[in-house]
Design a protein with these regions (language model features):
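A short glycine-rich, Lys/Arg-flanked "PGG" loop and its adjoining helix->strand segment in the class I
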Residues: 67-79
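A short SAM/SAH-binding and catalytic strip from SAM-dependent methyltransferases
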Residues: 52-67
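Conserved SAM-binding motif I beta-strand of class I
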Residues: 9-14
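Conserved SAM/SAH-binding beta-strand->alpha-helix loop
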Residues: 16-18
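C-terminal alpha-helical "lid/dimerization" subdomain adjacent to the S-adenosyl-L-methionine
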Residues: 86-142
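Core SAM-dependent methyltransferase catalytic element
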Residues: 142-163
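A short acidic, Gly/Pro-enriched loop at the edge of an enzyme's catalytic core
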Residues: 41-54
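Conserved SAM-binding strand-loop segment of SAM-dependent methyltransferases
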Residues: 30-43
Length: 163
């Protein structure tokens, strides 16, 4: 993104220090370190305010407190800002997820996503097959007034949330 939008600045956040170190190294190698910085921070503590765009990729369903994270995102966005949310594609019912991708995601979720969430504070445990309705409910409970699916692949749904 820093290469595609050279007039913008970017801050990447992750709670895993090794990932942050690697991201900073790659930004330097790509020649964008002057406009891309990285910090060790969780979804409820990343820095900044007035963001035009906040992104989250395949992580909301793994969080122990996705509502707390959504509230923090909301508090850091500009009044006309956008939260871009990428999550595993899922229907809202078990029956709608009984397909090859859904079955694989249920398996991953059983061994990774759900235990990860349960090990954290709150432990909501949305899991990889949360579905659009559950994501919508979290986002709107956090104070967002607009939520819509703006894209999808065979594996992911892409949502836009706005204040």
């Amino acid at each position: 993104m820093a290469q595609a939008f050279p007039a913008s600045t970017f801050t990447g956040s992750d709670y895993h220090e090794g990932s942050v170190t690697e991201a900073a190294k790659r930004a330097s190698e790509a020649g964008v370190a002057d406009r891309a910085s990285f910090e060790v921070a969780g979804a409820q503590s990343f820095s900044g305010t007035g963001h035009a765009l906040v992104t989250s990729f395949d992580c909301l369903h793994d969080m122990g407190d996705p509502l707390g994270a959504a509230r923090h995102v909301r508090s850091t966005l500009a009044a006309d800002g956008t939260w871009l949310i990428v999550e595993p594609i899922a229907g809202d019912t078990i029956e709608s997820n009984l397909n090859p991708v859904g079955r694989a995601y249920y398996a991953f979720s059983t061994f990774l996503c759900t235990p990860s969430s349960l090990s954290q504070d709150v432990g909501l445990a949305l899991g990889a097959q949360a579905g659009e309705k559950r994501i919508h409910d979290v986002v709107t409970a956090a104070g967002f007034t607009r939520f819509r699916r703006i894209g999808e692949t065979a594996f992911n749904a892409v949502y836009e949330a706005r204040p």
